[in-house]
Amino acid sequence: MRAPYQTLTILYKKENEQIKFAIFYRNSHPIWQFVSGGGEDNETPIETVVREIKEETSLIIDKSEIRQLDSRTTIPVLNITGKYTWGDSVFVVPEYTFAVELKNYDIKLSNEHKEYKWVEYREAMEKLRYDSNKTALWELNERLI
């Protein structure tokens, strides 16, 4: 069963003193975003991050590589599942944010995404649609510089 939370994970790499961020173009919606998804059954948010990265990119990440960010938001349930999955009184669920520095860049996209790009901070901010993605990116960038 779908757990009542969402995760957002920023994948980044450092090359020649530059930081680049992986953004993904969804097949189902014409938007750029980071790796995202909801928990399943009794997964912790960290376990969800590991699974979502594997599902969306084919990369295997160890839990120790995941950095939790302070940025959080809530998302309307109807935007996630299309119905009130967790009862009539649950209208929004939390979205927790994370970051992972990649050493292996061999991303193989799932059918959820049409393409991905490695971009610098400014371009990512221009392409991302959701404010929650932009806030998490700003926080991570500030922590890295």
Model-flagged regions — what are they?
Residues E95-W138:
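NUDIX/MutT-family hydrolases
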Residues M1-F21, D41:
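Conserved N-terminal beta-strand and adjoining loop/helix that marks the start
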Residues L59-N104:
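Active-site segment of metal-dependent pyrophosphate-handling enzymes
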Residues E139-L144:
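C-terminal alpha-helix
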Residues Q18-I61:
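Conserved Nudix-box catalytic region and its N-terminal flanking loop in Nudix hydrolases
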Residues L11-K13, Y25, E101-L102:
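Residue-level signal for short segments within beta-strands and strand-turn junctions
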Residues Q33, V92, W118:
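Short aromatic/basic micro-patch
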Residues N16-E17, S28-P30, E40-D41, R72-V77, ...:
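Short, charged/polar surface micro-motifs in flexible loops or helix N-caps
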